[in-house]
Amino acid sequence: MGVTVQDICFAFLQNYYERMRTDPSKLAYFYASTAELTHTNYQSKSTNEKDDVLPTVKVTGRENINKFFSRNDAKVRSLKLKLDTIDFQYTGHLHKSILIMATGEMFWTGTPVYKFCQTFILLPSSNGSTFDITNDIIRFISNSFKPYVLTDASLSQSNEENSVSAVEEDKIRHESGVEKEKEKEKSPEISKPKAKKETVKDTTAPTESSTQEKPIVDHSQPRAIPVTKESKIHTETVPSSTKGNHKQDEVSTEELGNVTKLNEKSHKAEKKAAPIKTKEGSVEAINAVNNSSLPNGKEVSDEKPVPGGVKEAETEIKPIEPQVSDAKESGNNASTPSSSPEPVANPPKMTWASKLMNENSDRISKNNTTVEYIRPETLPKKPTERKFEMGNRRDNASANSKNKKKPVFSTVNKDGFYPIYIRGTNGLREEKLRSALEKEFGKVMRITAADNFAVVDFETQKSQIDALEKKKKSIDGIEVCLERKTVKKPTSNNPPGIFTNGTRSHRKQPLKRKD
C-alpha cells in the first residue's frame, strides 16, 4: 500500500515542531524558495503580560525565513506545545497540494499558555517524493469571554425610555379623542335630507300621471304610431328619476331609515306598474296599424315605408304568448274593448353588428379552408455550378490566416527527443543552464541557444512534463520561463496562381460568338 495523506501530515508536523525545538536554523529547508511565513514577532515586547494574543510578523522568501529563525534561535528553542486537532485536505492544481490546519496550545519559558491555529500548504516537488511549504500562517485565539452584567447606568437608561414611551402614548390617545369630537360636530344636519325627500316626491308625481294616461288610437287613421314614441319616452324617464331617488336616499341619515324604506317600496311599485301600461299602449297602437286598411281598400304591408323608425319595430315583432295573471287581464278588459288583441312583448333590437354577423356567417364558415405549401425538393448541384461557388483569393487567404493563428505544439521532434522553449536566458551561460536543468528535471540531450531564448531537448517525456509544470525557474538570480515549443511555420513554394490548398484561380474569359 502507498503512503496516505494522513501519514504525510502526521510525519510533517512531527518533524516540523521537532526541528523548531532542536535546531531552528535548519527549519528554513522545509520552505520553498518563494514561500510566505506569518509567525510570532519575537522582537516586539508586549506591555501587558495578561494579553492572551501575541503580535505576528510576515516574512517572504527562504533566505529571509532562515534569517528570521536564526536571529531568534534561543527563543524558538524554548518552545513547548500541545496539538488538539489536525485537519487536512487536498488542494491546488490537480489536487496534488495538501492543506493542513492544526490547533492547540503553546508557550515559551516565562510566558503564559496561548491558544493558536496554524495553517500550512504543502506543494509536491518535481520528483513527487517530497513536499515544500509554500504558505505558513499562525493565528493566536483570544480567550476573553466576559459575562454581561447590568450596571446602574444601563438600568436608569431603560427606566427613562419606558417613561418617555408612556408619555407619548398618553399624548396620542388625547389627540385621537379630540379628533373624534370634531368629527361629531361636523356631522350633517337632519333637516337637509327632509328637503330632498320633498323634492323627490314632487318630481315623481307628474311621471305617475303621465304613465297612467293611455293613448287614444283611432282605427280609421294609420298615422297613430307616433304615440308609441311618447309612451316610450315616458317609460324611459321613470327609471332615470327613480335612479336619482335611490342615490339621494343613500345620503340620508340613520334616524330617517324607516321613512326611506317606505319610499323605496313605493318607488319600486311604480316602476313595475309604469312599463306594463306603456307596453300595452304601444302594442295596441302597432296592432291597430297592422289591422287598418287604406282608403282605396288595400291593406298596409310591411314593404311600404312608414314614418320614423317604426318599420324596424314592425318587422322585428314576433307573437309571444303573454304571461300575465288573471287579475291584470280583468283590469285591462274593463278599460279596453273586448276585441283588443293580447299584448305582445317587444323582441330585442337588432344592431348593425349583429345583422352583419348573420349575413357573413355563411361566408366565414366557407372560407375557413387552410392552404398547405409544400417545399420543393432540393436537386443536386451540377459540377458547373460548384465551380462558381468556389471562394476567391481573399476567402482562401483568410482561411489560411485562420489556420496559421492556431499554434501547433511539438512534443517529440524528429530525433526522438522532448523539446521545451525557455524564454529570458539573456546573460545566462549554457553550462549553468544545462547543470540546473539536469539537476532538477533529468538528462538534457541538446541545447540550442539564442540571444534571449533557448530550446532544450530532454531525453524522457517525464522530464519535459516536470519542466512545463514548473513554468518558472530561477538560475543564478535570473528567472526564466519554461514553455512548450511550437512547430516551425512551413514556407510556401507554390508557383503563382496556385493557392496553398491546391486550387487554381479561375479567370473570366470573354465569350466567343459562334458563327
Swiss-Prot record:
Present with 11700 molecules/cell in log phase SD medium. Residues 504-515 have a biased composition (Basic residues). Residues 202-213, 330-341, 489-503 have a biased composition (Polar residues). SUPFAM superfamilies: NTF2-like. It comes from Saccharomyces cerevisiae (strain ATCC 204508 / S288c). One of its GO terms (molecular function) is identical protein binding. This is UBP3-associated protein BRE5. The modification Phosphoserine is found at residues 187, 282, 340, 398. Residues 8-140 form the NTF2 domain. Residues 157-410, 485-515 are annotated as: Disordered. Has a role in de-ubiquitination. In conjunction with UBP3, cleaves ubiquitin, leading to the subsequent mono-ubiquitination of sec23. Heterotetramer with UBP3; contains two molecules of BRE5 and two molecules of UBP3. Forms a complex composed of CDC48, DOA1, deubiquitinase UBP3 and probably BRE5. Within the complex, interacts (via C-terminus) with CDC48; the interaction is direct and UBP3-independent. CDD domains: NTF2. Residues 157-166 have a biased composition (Low complexity).
